[in-house]
């Protein structure tokens, strides 16, 4: 364990899921180094633990190849400023949390300056653009992976990697309490609820709010007594969703909640959601789900040429088979979504729940503590390449 009186960590988290991981890692590091300093880009959970943000996390929350290109000048400015600030700070370690297209380039520059670098959350090199592994090898001293099958890929390419599990699997109980979640959210304890999660980023809502709202109308026709509840990450996303609701289903009642996505999923009988980390959370909460996603046509055409897998959601990737329905791009239509939700709400969930429980146990590793131990070991290590 490092004996230095004050350790300094530079960190960059690009979105909500990274903020959750970053806060968990900070809390674990603070157990042994209570006066450690944390600087870079973080979200509200990290800032609540004393993180010093140089830029708002929202700066990095962009999706899709085409969308990133439109923001490229600003992203390059942010990265350039961070390189300067972090190089001057000379931290004991830099930890890039997810956001690989931003962080790997940043790590490459910082490592060249003699700063130890960690990438927390393996990019999906096993799924698309596998040659990124060579850049990752140059940019990082260590990768912290969340999924067990990722480490074998890094071992094959002789890139230092530690499987730490997922902090969500540690935080979420093996059996979620629907009644308590409904009480907290002041929802009817007897009604049937579908949670609708169209994503946490503006670009996601731009693509998904309309088909999700239209699908809700069709679902209401199948299940006249069903109710809808939607968590929105902030006021901007709420306004975006309200606009879609007003435009496409002005008479449909959807109960909106700011934040509390985990509680909303726990309170629900089924979940319709965007592909992403939320699918892992839904799996850990153990609810029937339908995963849907689409991006701009050009982004999709470019991405399709680089894909190495035919599954997108984390439950299916972890299981190695189709456990939950995925409706991607051209299949992401109100009609197909409504049909899939109907099937999931009516089918026997027992075998799927058993698989979710198996996967939950597999990912329960005290991730934040394991990640902190790996980072501190790197800080103490001599002769690191």
UniProtKB/Swiss-Prot annotation:
Pathway: Bacterial outer membrane biogenesis; LPS lipid A biosynthesis. NCBIfam families: lpxB (TIGR00215). It is an enzyme of class 2 (transferase). Condensation of UDP-2,3-diacylglucosamine and 2,3-diacylglucosamine-1-phosphate to form lipid A disaccharide, a precursor of lipid A, a phosphorylated glycolipid that anchors the lipopolysaccharide to the outer membrane of the cell. It catalyses: a lipid X + a UDP-2-N,3-O-bis[(3R)-3-hydroxyacyl]-alpha-D-glucosamine = a lipid A disaccharide + UDP + H(+). This is Lipid-A-disaccharide synthase. One of its GO terms (biological process) is lipid A biosynthetic process. Keywords: Glycosyltransferase, Lipid A biosynthesis, Lipid biosynthesis, Lipid metabolism, Transferase. Its EC number is 2.4.1.182.
